[in-house]
Design a protein with these regions (language model features):
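Catalytic core of non-heme Fe(II) oxygenases with the double-stranded beta-helix
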Residues: 90-168
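Non-heme Fe(II)/2-oxoglutarate
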Residues: 1-102
Length: 168
């Protein structure tokens, strides 16, 4: 994998940044009424795409298409955007090129399951050198004070672990 991509200086120290909580109300109907697809990643999940490679209701990485392409220039799915305008605006407000954009309903799981399902994403596999590094943004939609994301630089080394609280 090439590392000749533009990166943000704010990511240099830890590789991640915690954004401010979103202070605007979001009607739960925006994520509850979306069309979810039967597509599995890890854990007990459901996925509702808002943007995909070609604007279809599917969740594949953009590199799975013929021809394969970088995980950028996603096409908003009109029927989903109409249901979730506030969520879409939250994404668009970042001002970045959006690739896959999905609502992921992940059921609570154990710490052991979280580690078992951990994986290193390879979202830059088709990203041309000299372009911006593909990033992921996570936004917790429901309030669970015990919810957190586990990040590890080395999946086998607990000393590299960071836990990020996920307030709604």
């Amino acid at each position: 994998m090439s590392l000749n991509h533009l990166t943000l200086s704010i990511l240099e120290e830890t590789g991640y940044v915690v954004l401010d909580s979103y202070q605007q109300p979001i009607d739960p109907a925006e994520w509850k009424n979306l069309e979810y697809v039967d597509w599995k990643s890890s854990g007990d999940t459901r996925f509702a795409p808002l943007a995909s490679a070609y604007g279809d209701i599917e969740c594949n990485g953009f590199w799975h298409f013929d021809p394969p392409k970088a995980d950028k220039d996603g096409v908003w799915i009109d029927s989903q955007v109409a249901i979730a305008p506030t969520l879409v605006e939250r994404v668009r407000a970042v001002g970045a090129n959006v690739g896959r954009c999905r609502i992921i309903e992940l059921q609570a799981n154990s710490y052991a399951d979280a580690l078992y399902n951990s994986h290193l994403d390879d979202n830059n596999r088709r990203n041309p050198d000299g372009e911006g590094w593909v990033l992921r943004l996570f936004m917790q939609l429901t309030h669970n004070p015990d919810s957190f994301m586990v990040l590890r630089e080395d999946i086998n080394d607990p000393s590299t672990e960071t836990r990020i609280s996920l307030p709604a």
